[in-house]
Amino acid sequence: MIGRLLRGGFMTAIYAYLYIPIIILIVNSFNSSRFGINWQGFTTKWYSLLMNNDSLLQAAQHSLTMAVFSATFATLIGSLTAVALYRYRFRGKPFVSGMLFVVMMSPDIVMAISLLVLFMLLGIQLGFWSLLFSHITFCLPFVVVTVYSRLKGFDVRMLEAAKDLGASEFTILRKIILPLAMPAVAAGWVLSFTLSMDDVVVSSFVTGPSYEILPLKIYSMVKVGVSPEVNALATILLVLSLVMVIASQLIARDKTKGNGGDVK
C-alpha cells in the first residue's frame, strides 16, 4: 500500500513538473497582466497583437515552411534508405547504419560547427538552402530508425511469396512494404517536423539574417523578458502540435486496421 502511494506520488510529481509550466504559459496568454505575475482578468489582446506583429509572423512562416520541406525530404529519403537497409545486402551496409547513429548521437554544437565549415568550404551562402540541408541532415536518421524498426516486424514470408508469384521489386515496394510501413512513415514525418520547428543550436550557426526562423526570433525576444505575444504564439503552436499528434495517431490506427492488424 505504501509502495503504491509512493509510486503514485512520484508519478504525480513528474507529471506536475512537466505540465504545470505549460499550463502557466497557456493561462498567461489570456492574462491581461503584461508581466503575468498575477491574474488581472481574461483577455485576447495578446493574440490580436500577435496577428499584427509582422516580424514574428514572418519568422513563424519561415519556420513552418522549413519544417514542412525538411520533414518531407527527410521522410522521403529516410524511408527509401530504411527499405534499402532492410531489403538488400551491399558493401558498406554496416558503415551506413553506424553513421546514421553517429549523426543521432552527436551533440548539436558538433553538428552545427561541422555543417558551417562544410558550407564555408563549398561557398554556400547562409540562408534558406543551408538551413534546409542542415535540417534534413539531422532529421534523416530519426526517420530511418523509425521506419526500419517497423520493417523489422514484417513477416518475410509475405515478401517471398509475392516474389514467387512474379511480383517485381517495385511492385513489392508499392503494394506491400509502403502500405505496411505507412504508420512509421507518418510518425517519422511528424517527428522530423517537430525537430525542425524546435531547433535552435544548429539553426543559429547555419542561417543568415535574410532568413530568420521562429526559435531564433523567440530566443532573441526572451533575452529581455517573456513577451505576452510569445505566450500566445507558444499556445497556438502547442495546439497545432496536439492536432498533428492526434491526426498521426488516427492515420496510423486506420492504416493498421486497413492492413488487418500488425504483421508479426
From Swiss-Prot:
GO terms for biological process: transmembrane transport. It is a multi-pass membrane protein. It is found in: Cell inner membrane. Its main location: membrane. Pfam families: BPD_transp_1. PANTHER family: PUTRESCINE TRANSPORT SYSTEM PERMEASE PROTEIN POTI, SPERMIDINE_PUTRESCINE TRANSPORT SYSTEM PERMEASE PROTEIN POTC. This is Spermidine/putrescine transport system permease protein PotC. It comes from Shigella flexneri.
